[in-house]
Structures are given as C-alpha cells and as structure tokens.
C-alpha cells in the first residue's frame, strides 16, 4: 500500500482502501508511522474517497495517528467521507 501514499510539502496524503478493517489496519498503521517520521510531516490527511466500509479498526488508525501528531504539534484530517463512513464518526 505504501506506493499510494504521497507527500505534499509537510503533509502526508493517505488514500484509504475500499475496506478498512482489522486485516489492513496493523500494516497501514506501521507504514504510516514509518513514513510520517521519515518524511517529517506535520499533517496527515486520510482520504476516504474510495472507502465503502470501515470498522473500529479504521477508527483506531486515525486515533493512533492523531496521538502521534499531537505529540509533535501536528494535525490529522479526514476528507471525502462517504455516507457510510461518516455515520461512524457521527455516533
């Protein structure tokens, strides 16, 4: 998945997969952490444009990266939330 990630200035763009569940969460978290550190980013943008399903593992990815970014005065943003994914954040 790493090839899909990209850096723009001090921002890391993370295109989220179609399904975000426990099968992808662990690897994604590790990859994002490693790249964010090596790229010295201060913002991570999670792009949900292509995501149809997300369970609590996906929430864990975002919360874990937010904690990391908070320690470095950075930010985490979620964009292009479809209706199904948005409902998870509403609750």
Q: Language-model segments: what does each one mean?
A:
Residues 22-91:
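Amphipathic alpha-helical interaction surfaces in cytosolic regulatory modules
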Residues 1-2, 40:
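Short, charge-rich amphipathic segments
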Residues 2-30, 48-49:
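STAS-typified acidic loop motif
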């Amino acid at each position: 998945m790493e090839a899909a990630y990209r850096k723009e200035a001090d921002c890391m763009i993370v295109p989220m997969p179609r399904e975000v569940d426990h099968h992808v969460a662990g690897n994604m978290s590790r990859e994002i952490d490693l790249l964010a550190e090596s790229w010295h980013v201060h913002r991570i943008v999670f792009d949900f444009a292509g995501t149809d399903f997300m369970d609590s593992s996906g929430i864990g990815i975002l919360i874990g990266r937010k904690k990391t970014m908070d320690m470095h005065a950075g930010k985490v943003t979620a964009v292009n939330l479809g209706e199904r994914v948005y409902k998870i954040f509403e609750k």
